Amino acid sequence: MNLKTLTMVALATSVVIAAVAQEKAKETLKVELPKPCFTGTPKDIKTENLEAPMGDKERDPIQVPAGTKVISKGCKVTSSDSEPIIGELGFVTDGDKDHDATTYVELGPNTQWVQIDLGKEKQISAACVWHFHGEARVYRDVVCQISNDPDFIDGVQTVFNNDHDDSSKLGKGKDKEYIETNKGRPFAISNVKGRYVRFTSRGNTSNEMNHYTEIEIYGKDL
């Protein structure tokens, strides 16, 4: 075996070792869930882009880099609706995920967003959103975007989008709509860096308002 071949083998081996080490450095994301709180009779929800109901089934586990933690608790929240109908914007990151009249913020109708300022650019690996889990309902046009621009004009990365018909004008999404439960909607975010995280929605199957109980962003300092 000549020197060139040995060098190529050594490089290939180092790549494999690095990949294995990186994989071992990952862990399963653990999301602390609030108690279930469905009230009343479940409605027959009809929507063309709905995922199969989860029931007692668990979502596939999300793998994140070791040391990943909640980086959004207590962070400043702004919104397209500066005067919420119910609640306060601070509820979105206060850590209280339980459902009652004092834990969620209600925004006006049509397309609205809430935006979390992480304070500085962070490495973001996952997120979980709880809109309103007091009953089974589906929120429309749920979109999550990340940017270092607070106005979301430059460098915007869309990491979740179930607006299948582009009715909120943020592009057509491939994710499915889902029924709200106490488990929220967690999703992985692959190697994205940013300071601001914006969640958008456009009403729900019960009424035209937009609600947020809690949003958790998971990541690490750079």
What are these regions (language model features)?
Residues 1-7:
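Bacterial N-terminal signal peptides that target proteins for export
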Residues 12-19:
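Hydrophobic h-region of N-terminal signal peptides that target proteins for export
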Residues 22-69:
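N-terminal pre-domain segments of enzymes
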Residues 22-41, 80-82, 106-113, 122, ...:
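Trp- and acidic/polar-enriched beta-sheet ligand-binding modules for extracellular glycan
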Residues 60-96:
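Predominantly extracellular/luminal regions of secreted and cell-surface proteins
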Residues 100-106:
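Surface-exposed, low-complexity/disordered Ser/Thr/Gly/Pro/Asn-rich loops and linkers
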